[in-house]
């Protein structure tokens, strides 16, 4: 009997759906979940964010950095 092939479950975008959080540059707690410990934006293939929402997220993170709500780099 052959072993059943392993299928990795497709991750769903955390920003799609009815009660999904809104991406806002003022919501630093939400944005920090998508920044690495070195201060870099985590890629969507790791966070499972859709391409459209990843662009929105990157824009919000960059805006928050510019307004000094988030650090550019962590020492």
Curated annotation (Swiss-Prot):
GO terms under biological process: translation
Span of the signal peptide: none
InterPro entries xrefs: Ribosomal_bS18 (IPR001648), Ribosomal_bS18_CS (IPR018275), Ribosomal_bS18_sf (IPR036870)
Gene Ontology molecular function terms on file: small ribosomal subunit rRNA binding; structural constituent of ribosome
Gene3D superfamilies, A to Z: Ribosomal protein S18
Domain of life: Bacteria
One Gene Ontology cellular component: cytosolic small ribosomal subunit
Keywords: Ribonucleoprotein, Ribosomal protein, RNA-binding, rRNA-binding
Protein family according to the UniProt entry: Belongs to the bacterial ribosomal protein bS18 family.
Job description of the protein: Binds as a heterodimer with protein bS6 to the central domain of the 16S rRNA, where it helps stabilize the platform of the 30S subunit.
HAMAP family (alphabetical): Ribosomal_bS18
Quaternary context: Part of the 30S ribosomal subunit. Forms a tight heterodimer with protein bS6.
Designated name of the protein: Small ribosomal subunit protein bS18
Gene behind this protein: rpsR
